[in-house]
UniProtKB/Swiss-Prot annotation:
The keyword Cytoplasm is annotated on this UniProt entry: yes
UniProt keyword Glycosyltransferase, yes or no: no
Localization terms from the record: Cytoplasm; Golgi apparatus
GO cellular component, one term: Golgi apparatus
Annotated spans, Disordered: 650-671
PANTHER family per the UniProt record, alphabetical: PROTEIN HID1, UBP5-INTERACTING PROTEIN FTP105
InterPro entries, per the entry: Hid-1/Ecm30
The name this protein goes by in its record: Ubp5-interacting protein ftp105
Comp. bias intervals (Low complexity): 650-664
Keywords of this entry: Cytoplasm, Golgi apparatus
Major location (coarse): cytoplasm
Subunit details: Interacts with ubp5.
Amino acid sequence: MGGQESKLAFQRGIARLASQPDIPLDDEVWVSLWSVPESCPEVYDFFPPGLIREMRDHAFVNLEKLLLVLTSRLFALKNDKKFPNPETAPASEALNCIRLLTRIIPFLNEKLDLEEWHQKFWWSLRKKRNLPKENSELDLSNFQDDLDFENSISQKNEFSQKSPSVPLSPVSTFPASSISLDASSDVSAADVSVGGSSTIKEIGSIEETFTHEKTLMEELLDTVFRLLFCRGFTLPLSSPEQYAYIIWENGIGTTETQEKTTKELAFNRIEVLRLLLVLISKRLYRSSEVASHTLTYLTCVANKQLILVFLYSLINTTLRLRPDSWKASYSTLVPYNDSSIALSKLTSQILLLFLDHTPHETTVEYFRQRLNLSPGAAIENQYRLYFSRLQLQADYEFLVNELYRLLNAPVSAISAYISIVQKPNIAFPEIILFLWQAILYNKRFRAFLITSPYATEFLTSIQFYALRYREDNEHSGLVRICLFIVHYLSCEKVLCEKLNRNCMNAQSLMSSLGFSVPPMSYAEFLIISSFHISAVKRSPFSSLSPVILLTICNIAPFVENLSFVTCAKLMQLCSSLSSPRFLFRNPRNHLLLEYLLQAISSIVENKFSQNPNLSYSIIRLQQVFLNLNSMKLPAVAQTKSQPLVALNSEGSSDFESKSSDNTSLDGTPLQNTDFKKVATVEDDSPFDELDKFSSPFSSSSSRGGLSHISSRNVSISVPTVLQDVFSDSPLVLSRKLRGKIPENVSSSELIKKCASNPFGKDLEIDSNLFAPSNSWFNSWHSRLELDSILAIISQFSLPVYKKMNEELSTTDEAVKLLANSVLNDVHPRVPNFRYFIWSVPMNNWFQSLVWLYTLSFDEKGLMATPSLFTTSKVYKQHGNIMKVASPENSSNSMENATKSILDKLDLLYLQLPSSVNHDSSLRNK
């Protein structure tokens, strides 16, 4: 029936599905569903969205029959011992059934008022008349039993969404018998199915035998899993059995080399995985999280052995990706026509969703009653459990090597190509998401990763991606995950001790993004890149500023040999965060200052002699610290109503007089500028970093003019010439305006074009609702860790001043003096790591992020064609789906909830002072 005439007849037949109310089951249109189409695009062409919606809205009985016919034919093919057989059980028929289900189900999910129907149709127990047939021929007359049973369900038993119990039916009145899918394993909640037989007396004392079947969705999911491990369909013909639990690719759980997968087998796997992804996609069509029976059954109730083999297959297939067009991965060129790309995308998305799923209490109660379990019986995610139990070193080596290869490919391409036209892009962001889950759910793997030679390279690559996409709203969720990973790894002492090594790729990585920096260590790369991520105006990651600063706190006790460039960034942050205008805007802004002062104090107390540049920078910036120490609420409360930047004429003239020795971070003179403290940011979109215009510590020549700094209001017994070289509120100049300013513009005119402190919006709420009080001020001001900083100022200000006034003396001499000195009355502190706490709301946000990338990949055709979701109303339901995890979507309740959670992270840190709580929190998950 593959000819043109049969296709035209088939097209006329399926048109009747929407126009004719109740098509008989003996009509030839049902059989032609799996025999006529020859490809997936043909199936999608025969069933356009309008036809499916019309059938759903006006001929729903036909749609129910269609689903029953397709699933039953698929079950019959699966049960055929010769499948796949071109004569009796062809694989093409199974593929057509799979394609039709993949096409139709999204349009059922998009209609919200079908929720009760979903529960009755897919999750109600069924009865089947026992038949002696063993072949795969489908007797359509037998479907009347199913339809009668569905009608009895609708008439007699109204399912309430508030009750998680199994709907009552003639079948459910019998005790459910639990049988194990795997005879060799113990019976438990993870490997139990329901079935059995009974004899029901009919009218006239005629006895017929019926089987108590599993629900239709359970049977469909079991069939899908069987087809994923079917000889000749998704497994090589050399497999010993028709359905064999064989891991698809070499890697975790395999000791023997697996046979290479042919393109035909790969395409069949893609088709089945596409259906599996559609079956668990109801979350896309709901504005909030819903209880998913499907995901819970797949992750918690399915057969243990199958779960284990499928988990290993998903991981190995995802990480074994070696596309033919990989050479172009550093650019935006992604190989769309490579079947391995689609297979890897599908396996990675399903893997992430399975590992992340936490069963909803409603679903847990449903399956407890469904499986006759005790009320307190545990139903947990088996994928997460088995992954957490990985412990073989060979498995860890495979994970680390393959993750490093995939993450480092775009990064290594930067140094491999002389001319980089575009910024390097990551073609597989799901790899970063999987890395986060790996270190979150397997503590032994995290320890192995930290001790591996690739540990610092992992940290560099992840931080680089956060820096790369800091202004890309589409990848804002990815940046958050990157920052979480870096923060989580920064809590490990073994890794922190490695961060003082020279970072070989730092200059090439930063230059690829337009930053000019000198050679630096891994620790300096983290500090400078963190500065460029957070210290930007209107940053979408302002709520993550506590995470970023606490990452610096974690590595601070181990940092050595900080350069002047890095110290300048720390001093800029300190100057911005200590501004009264910033501190009194919000009742929680002081937390950022506390975290930064903790980091600086930790460096001073633990590595004073190894960081003379930082000590010198503190002395240069001493006025900020002295003012902060002597700050009083009555004296500064009025700054709340004053402009953030206020320079008088005297300050302006002094501002201009110091422009002659202005240099950039790399020591090169700045051309056509007569200002020194101007930052470069964006005007209308995400703002860029405070860049090279803001550092006075560029070279010995520019640092030698310490004695020329004017004296202003120093209220401590130190030389008045040691004056702050930073403004309390650094000025910011938009990138758009930078190229339009005339060469000889005055500073007063330039100030008018400058914006305010880039931290001005961090953690901000309505400032009109907050009135600072003495109790609030004293509660945090007394906790500021200024003792070690003030000790440096008190002990070394005069010696440094005298050293700088000596003839032929340079800044290097002063730095050498500090390096050979000992800080009195200051003792090292024990490192106190702050750990990130992953909670259930964060799980929900992570799941939405995974679906965000799923939709993005599907829209681009990266998960095979045709698209799975673009023709359904998932986009219209969410508005622009790319805004689900976007920080600018103020109308999205999910993102608002996520931002609220992230804004409160600082409170979590205050409640978690030691690593003991961290370990206990992991055990309680």
